[in-house]
Regions:
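N-terminal membrane-proximal hinge/A-helix region immediately C-terminal to the signal-anchor transmembrane segment
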Residues: 1-103, 118, 122-130, 150, ...
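Short, histidine-centered active-site or binding-site loop motifs used for metal coordination
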Residues: 49, 112, 246
Length: 271
């Protein structure tokens, strides 16, 4: 049967697109659970933009077929993640298609296997022990802030090779500011719904995001420039790996590609 016809025959979530988009932004797990209960383990959604006409699967065997099948029936178009462009740019692995996507994955995946994962695990345990050692008996702890501190320290050390210093503190502080804009459903709507992406000054959610992102961009490009000038092939952090990588024609990654991949790793690692 024609794939387009098969897709057309799938049960489709019936609520209006704006309501679905709001539910997706504010309560994504409830939205998917409720849709599965009403429409079954394979259903289609209709939202605006890149989330229009998407098919969701919850059956484990169907998911396995999509992820591991060798017949190339299923693609992973980067456009499906277009809603993340304001955060990640458009040259990170999540936004790439086809051969470019596979090539970038092959470059990155060795950093998340075997000995590398064990090193990251040891680092997480050390950072956690050091943090907990500073707690006092009967002291009230904001656990979310403590866990965020661990996450960001791990990211900055494994991705950038930064352990301390002015740029470490600047990137960490600015990243926290940008991430904080996604913590409220109301603020998130201004970041992810195109019609609400209006720069009304630094006091507006979108305006504040643009200004925070601009500062973070400058910090990342400055770090990339410093690392290119002082490239050390024996360093093991991911930024060093990406700077030293070459494609089949011997071309390296551009500053924009490096920046977008770093943003992807920063946000994905934090989540």
């Amino acid at each position: 049967m024609n794939q387009n016809l098969m897709t057309a025959l799938l049960p489709t979530v019936k609520s209006p697109s704006p309501i679905q988009l709001w539910q997706w932004i504010t309560e994504p797990l409830d939205y998917m659970d409720n849709s599965e209960r009403e429409y079954g383990d394979i259903f289609k959604i209709r939202m605006s933009g890149v989330l229009n006409n998407c098919v969701f699967l919850s059956d484990p065997k169907a998911i396995q077929q999509v992820l591991t099948g060798t017949d190339k029936q299923f693609a992973a178009p980067g456009s499906i993640n277009g809603i993340l462009k304001p955060f990640l740019g458009d040259r990170g692995v999540l936004l790439l298609d086809g051969g470019e996507h596979r090539q970038r994955r092959q470059l990155l995946m060795p950093q998340f296997h075997g000995d590398k994962i064990r090193v990251y695990t040891e680092l997480i345990c050390k950072l956690t022990r050091d943090l907990v050692a500073g707690w006092q008996v009967d002291e009230t702890i904001n656990l979310r802030e403590q866990m965020q501190s661990i996450s960001l320290s791990v990211i900055l050390q494994t991705v950038f090779g930064l352990y301390e210093g002015e740029r470490y503190e600047q990137i960490q502080a600015k990243l926290i500011q940008v991430i904080s804009l996604t913590e409220s459903p109301v603020k998130s709507s201004f970041l992810f719904i195109p019609a609400l992406q209006q720069d009304l000054g630094a006091w507006s959610p979108w305006g504040r995001f643009l200004r925070d992102r601009e500062v973070l961009d400058r910090l990342l490009y400055a770090e990339i420039a410093d690392r290119r000038r002082n490239y050390q092939p024996d360093r093991s952090d991911i930024l060093n790996l990406l700077i030293g990588s070459k494609d089949a024609e011997g071309n390296g990654m551009s500053d924009i590609e490096l920046h977008d991949e770093l943003m992807t790793l920063l946000f994905a690692g934090h989540e």
